[in-house]
Structures are given as C-alpha cells and as structure tokens.
Amino acid sequence: MKHRYLKSNLIACLLTATITGGCLFTSCEDWTDPEEVDYTIQDPSEQNPELSARYIESLRVYKLERPHYITYASFNNGIEPSKNEGDYIRSLPDSLDFVTLANSENITTADREDIPELQEKSTRVLYHVDYAKKMAELPDEAALGAWLDKAVSTVAKLKMDGFAFSGIPLYGGTDIEQAARKASARLIVSKLSATGKALVFEGDPSFVDAAD
C-alpha cells in the first residue's frame, strides 16, 4: 500500500513537471517571436518644429547678443566613416561659440554636411591654419602665399566663419631670419584678415606684431 502511494505521488509529480515545462516552453516561444522595430533617428526639427525653432533662436540670442564667457574648442576632424557618434563634429555641445577644425586640410564629406548644422546653432566653425606645424614645408613667401590662398578658398567654398592660425616666434637667429619670420606673420595676418571673417591666434603672441 505504501509503495502504491509513493508510485502515485511520483506519477503526479512527473505530470506536473511536464505540464509546467510545456507552459514555460510555450511562453519562451511567444517571447522570442521576431518583431520589427523602427530605429529611424529623427532630427529634433522633425519631431517638434516649433520647439526646435525656439531653441535655435535662444542659442542665437545668447551667443550673439548677450554678454557671456566665450567657449572655444578644437576638434580632431577628418576621421574616416565611424560608428562612434563622438567622431563627428555634429556631436559637439550646442553651447560652443567657436570650434576650430584641427585637420582643416582633410575636411571629409561628413564634416561638410555637419558644418551648417553647427552654424544653425550659432557655433562658428574655423579653419585651422597651422603654420607652426607646416612652416618647414613653406620655405618662402610664394609657397606660404599659395598655401594661404588654398585655405581662404576652402573657407569661402564651405562658408566657414573664419580662421585660427598658429605660429612660433624666432627667439634667436640672424637679422635676416628674424625679418623673414616677421614677414611670414604679416603675410598670414594680411591674407586671412582680408576676408573680413573671424581671426583667432593660437600660440605665443610675440609671433605677431601689434601693428599687424
């Protein structure tokens, strides 16, 4: 009698486990049914055009009309197509007043597409004229002038907002070398300022004479 009771209990337990397992299996199948998800990224102006327009206007008023501390950054642009959003200039904070494209001689298609987006938010985008890095490759004023003309042409074509340039003063050397370095600085300032666009210097200010 005792053995029959144990056998009945065992059968009942097995039936219960089978039924429960079947339910769980069915539930899992329901959960793993494929479902199409829309991952289309909408621009804020498409989600709420009125709110977006008000936000853009508030940025313009703040940056161009109200006294505030200027925020300035340099961005290492020119990265090949990347899955990392942080590699694109469109990922920069809206609060920036100026951003210099560090690799301005390698402005990619993505950079070209993103520049107007930054400008819409009143962020001014500058071309980097890195004379401190390139001066060894520019032995005379003719070579320097041609290089500067290319920068001016690019800024005009892409409707950028100006230039940031760098230079290193000559602390020693002969009078001729000193004069050549000063002439280079004058040519840079003259060419870039003639555009009427923003002009920022990065480096030791003694590279540029106050009169220039």
Where do the PLM segments sit?
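Bacterial Sec-dependent N-terminal signal peptides
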Residues: M1-S8, A17-E65
